[in-house]
């Protein structure tokens, strides 16, 4: 009997142990289960690039978006429209009409202060240059970019022009003054950081001879840019002798310090991995970092007290030539992205949200494209997560079906705070009827969003980013 009781007791203890272990296993979330979108995620749609001419049709489209759970529409507020008449001569009437239409539909409105040119890039269907009077404010050498072959690019003001910050500050101030009355429908504001609204150089521009999957070209060949590079190197090392020691060169004058004279050779001959190459690439990115700090500070100064919402900027998804053995990461570096860790830290320092693109794309890392967009999304997202930088996403090209599933995977895995789809006509026809893609967008993206319980008037976060 004693033996029976002992065995029975041991059996009960074993059973209890198994039950407790099973309970602990069930109660502990797996890595997959713990991955989730952010609590405040919202789904948004990008409006047309060009001006609205048929407001009746546009309002029907907006109503369809609202009825299907879309939170906000994101809009380029073109500098070339609002300040075209002259310096500090603003006309915001078109965008007030636009905001009224959005408000009437019960949607939120996310403006992008678009200080870049529209036209000439993938997906551009309009031609909106920068205000023409800008040319009287400085020299072309100061205000424009110039690439390896001498092509001068005026898609956006060069960050190296001393007047860039002042012009943006005046634009931001006027926007805040004119749209303070619309703050109930503005949950976020985006800043254009450069070409196509992205914080980058205009390295891949078809008019300059670029075509996919070309690496693009460095944009540091104005005298202003060359002198800035020389000054930065002299400041870093303290003297030409110390520069020569670091680089293993025999320069006799600071004027002999130049950006790479042969962009292809810079990679194929290994120059990118030399002390000189690393210094150049680091400086080249630092120009963008400083620019982000300038526009971020101006935006916070003008917007925080008026709107009290998050402000964001954009990094481009330069996903090709990433694993090219002869030119690794050459496309990213021509665009100004050398060290993502350092660049994303600047977003943290400037208190800006980060938007990234190409969430719908899959890797295909073979020649000639060497394209790794999914890997790039993971890299950027992981760094942002580690630094506590809020993430928002967008598609690079028109998408649907499996692309929506890929987007769902990324926004869930990395806790994205929102997603904006390019572009409204992909989801809604001009007569307001849904396209075949709207159901997929609802299933995979809108279904992740949180209901707006503020009657269309509360401030929440949404997102926008421009192509990759």
UniProtKB/Swiss-Prot annotation:
Gene Ontology molecular functions: beta-amylase activity; metal ion binding
Binding site for substrate: 76, 116, 124, 314, 319, 357, 395-396, 423
Signal peptide range: 1-36
Keyword Disulfide bond appears in the UniProt entry: yes
Pfam families documented for this protein: Glyco_hydro_14 (PF01373)
Location of the active site: 198 (proton donor), 394 (proton acceptor)
Protein name: Beta-amylase
Keyword Cytoplasm: no
Disulfide bonds: 118-126
Domain of life where this protein originates: Bacteria
Species whose genome carries this gene: Cytobacillus firmus (Bacillus firmus)
Matching SUPFAM superfamilies: (Trans)glycosidases (SSF51445)
Catalysed reaction equations from the record: Hydrolysis of (1->4)-alpha-D-glucosidic linkages in polysaccharides so as to remove successive maltose units from the non-reducing ends of the chains
UniProt-listed GO biological process terms: polysaccharide catabolic process
């Amino acid at each position: 009997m004693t033996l029976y009781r002992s065995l029975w007791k041991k059996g009960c203890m074993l059973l209890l142990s198994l039950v407790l272990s099973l309970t602990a296993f069930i109660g502990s979330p797996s890595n997959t289960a713990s991955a989730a979108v952010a609590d405040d995620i919202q789904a948004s749609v990008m409006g047309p690039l060009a001006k609205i001419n048929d407001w009746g049709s546009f309002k029907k489209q907006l109503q369809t978006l609202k009825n299907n759970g879309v939170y906000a529409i994101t809009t380029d507020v073109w500098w070339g429209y609002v300040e075209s008449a002259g310096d500090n001569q603003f006309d915001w009437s078109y965008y007030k009409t636009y905001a009224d239409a959005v408000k009437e539909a019960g949607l939120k409105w996310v403006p992008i202060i678009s200080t870049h040119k529209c036209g000439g890039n993938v997906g551009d269907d309009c031609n909106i240059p920068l205000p023409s009077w800008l040319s009287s404010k400085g020299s072309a050498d100061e205000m424009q970019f110039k690439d390896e072959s001498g092509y001068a690019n005026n898609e956006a003001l060069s960050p190296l022009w001393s007047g860039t910050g002042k012009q943006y500050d005046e634009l931001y101030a006027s926007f805040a003054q004119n749209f303070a009355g619309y703050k109930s429908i503005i949950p976020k504001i985006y800043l254009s950081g450069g070409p196509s609204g992205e914080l980058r150089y205009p390295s891949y521009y078809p008019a300059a001879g670029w075509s996919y999957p070309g690496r693009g070209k460095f944009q540091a060949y104005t005298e202003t840019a060359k002198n800035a590079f020389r000054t930065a190197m002299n400041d870093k090392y303290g003297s030409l002798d110390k520069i020569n020691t670091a680089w293993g060169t025999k320069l006799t004058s600071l004027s002999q310090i130049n950006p790479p004279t042969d962009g292809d050779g810079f990679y194929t001959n290994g120059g990118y991995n030399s002390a000189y190459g690393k210094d150049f690439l680091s400086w080249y990115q630092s120009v963008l970092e400083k620019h982000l700090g300038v526009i971020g500070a101006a935006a916070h100064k003008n917007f925080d007290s008026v709107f009290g919402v998050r402000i964001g900027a954009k990094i481009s998804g330069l996903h090709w030539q990433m694993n090219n053995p002869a030119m690794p990461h050459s496309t990213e570096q021509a665009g100004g992205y050398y060290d993502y860790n350092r660049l994303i830290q600047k977003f943290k320092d400037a208190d800006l949200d980060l938007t990234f693109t190409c969430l719908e794309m899959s890797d295909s890392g073979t020649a000639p494209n060497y394209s790794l967009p999914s890997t790039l999304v993971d890299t950027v997202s992981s760094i942002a997560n580690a630094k506590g930088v809020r993430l928002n996403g967008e598609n690079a090209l028109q998408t649907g079906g499996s692309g929506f599933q890929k987007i769902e995977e990324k926004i869930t895995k990395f806790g994205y705070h929102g997603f904006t789809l390019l572009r409204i006509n992909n989801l809604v026809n001009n007569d307001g009827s849904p396209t075949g893609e709207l159901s997929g967008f609802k299933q995979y993206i809108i279904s992740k969003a949180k209901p707006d319980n503020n009657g269309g008037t509360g401030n929440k976060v949404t997102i926008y980013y421009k192509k990759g």
